[in-house]
Structures are given as structure tokens and as C-alpha cells.
Amino acid sequence: MRDFFQEQLKELNRELIQMGADCEEIIALASDSLTGWNGELAKNVSIIGARIDEGYRTVENICLKLLLRQQPVARDLRVISAAMKMITDMERIGDQAEDIVDLVPRMERRADEKYPKIREMAKAAQQMVTEAVDAYVKQDLELAYAVMKHDDIVDDYFDRVKKGIIGIIAENPTEGEYALDLLMIAKYFERIGDHCTNIAEWVEFSVTGTHKDCQ
């Protein structure tokens, strides 16, 4: 019985790793869309978004089976519960990347033309996804804490982008709509960083049994 449980946990980890890889890829495509949006890119984003949604359903199904059939002990129960919370954040990461790609075509010009820091922000968010999933699979508390700290980097990028956008509007008020679209894109990337932080916090819960919302 325990061997079967361990095999199911391995399958759970494989699915989470795949979801994490898909999240990385969809963020990279969202970043690429800022400078080179095209129909093929948008199609690929939709495909990956659907794959993330399917991964969500698969992981949820594995977790429910483990909970209902295996009666996991406390530590295993935390790992399974954390996985169910994490996939919600990963699914939202996919949604927000799709929202970015949907927004870019309506802009009059390249989204990073006047403020390329957005691409650096996207890269930082992409790294957070990789580290957050690795932290879960390895049950690495130090890596989870590093992800939480990296959110400060994404937040700092957002603040700098926001100030730059205010400068764009002050310099030329007619560019207000462009600037607001730019701000929305930056906000989506900032939220992606927040979701990665949430994942890291659930890793902390799975390892220690404590979570900031439960204290």
C-alpha cells in the first residue's frame, strides 16, 4: 500500500514539474509578445494555456484519490494539500500570461519600446516559477524562502515601470491609453510574481506545517 502511495506521489511531482515547465514557457512567450506578437505566438500561448488547465485537473484528481483512498499521515497530507493550493496559483499564472498576449495586439507599437524593464520583470517572474516548483519537488525550505525574497525584485521592477509610465504621460498626455496598457501588462507580471510567492509559502507549509494565513 505504501509503495503504491509513493508511486502516486512521484506521479504528482511529475505532473507539477510539467505544469511548472508550461508556466515558464507561457511567461516566456508573453514576454516575447511584447516585441514580436504574431498569430502563431498567440496560438501557442492558447495551446499551453489549455495544457496548464489540463494539468490542473490531472493533479487535482491525483490529490483527491490520495486523500480518499490512502489516508495519508500528517506530513504526506501537508504535501498533498500544498499541491492542491499550488495548482490554483499555477493556473492563474497561465491565465495572466494569456491576458498579456491578448492585450499586446491592441497597442499602437511595441510594448517595451519606451520601457524595456518590463522584459526584465518577465524574466525575473519566470525564474521564480522555476525555483518555486523546484522547492516543492525537493521540499527545499531555503529555496522557498529565496523565492519569497525574489518577489521583492519583481515588485521593484513594477515600481520602476510605474514611475516610467507616469513620465510617459507627463511628457505626452496623448499617449495615455498606451501608457495604461503598459501599466496593465506590468501589473500582470507583478501578479505572476505574487502567485510564485504563494507557491513558495505552500512549500513552507508542506515542510513545516505552518502557513502565514493559519497563524
Explain the meaning of each model-derived region.
Residues 1-215:
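Cytosolic, long alpha-helical scaffolding segments
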